[in-house]
Amino acid sequence: IKYIIKERTEKIVLPKTLGFGQIFTDHIFEMDYTKGKGWHNPTIKPLENLQIHPAMSVIHYGQSIFEGLKAFKTINDEIVIFRPDVHIQRLNNSARRICMPEVDVDFALEALKELVAIDSDWIPANRGEALYIRPFMFGTDPALGVRPSFDYKLVFLLSPVAAYYPEGFKPVKILIQDDYVRAVRKGLGECKTSANYAASLLAAQEASKKGFTQVLWLDGVEQKYLEEVGTMNIFVQFKDEIATPKLSGSILPGVTRRSVIQILKEWGMNVTERAISIDEVISAYDKGNL
């Protein structure tokens, strides 16, 4: 890894209100891919604007994927990152689905940890705050034509953040969405592609106008079974069971989802992955079993 470090002369002072994704650290990690050469030129360098060609393939054909994870400081001032290996593996899963090159997991983890260590002074210390890590990859070919790009760029971007929603860690209101479909099986639903989020914007905007924070998506065929919320998976606690929709090819396999299932099982709780109809949820609510 090549290092170009920006020497900071003043102390970092974070604002009292961080928001989400509005503030960025001093450095980024970049690495390029070209056909025939593979991944090369890994560099940690000062944050700067990306240069793009008007014909860059990602602008026209949407070949873009990303991840989102967090780094924290413990009470002993140690830096911990939440399951970064699983996130990089999921990035590779998304890459395969839309014909993008995979990255070496061990090397990507090394680069990620190095970047976080260099900008560790940006990690907030307050409860509920963290350093958000956004790995993303996109096609960079300066050419028109519907095909996989020959060239790509991988970037790691860091941002000190508070809670994602304005409500903080309080419960949020979600609107059951049956006018639009987020994804269908054998589509892109199980991948973290930019296209999935673009497709969700109109529904989220309409929900916001009605006073809701997010959308609860139903399956794309029958519009009957729970799938996920706009930015997260969902669990439903019934009287004697905690259930979450099973992964069917249209649901993002969340890292937090996977962790919650593992913890609940270790606690000896009855957790299941299965089809959950919205009618079942409403019925359980009416009977006082939700």
For each predicted feature, which ranges?
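Helix-start/capping segments and mature chain N-termini
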Residues: 1-115, 136, 143-290
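Charged, gly/pro-rich active-site loop segments
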Residues: 105-107, 115-128
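Extended, Lys/Arg-enriched charged tracts that mediate electrostatic binding to polyanionic substrates
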Residues: 124-134, 138
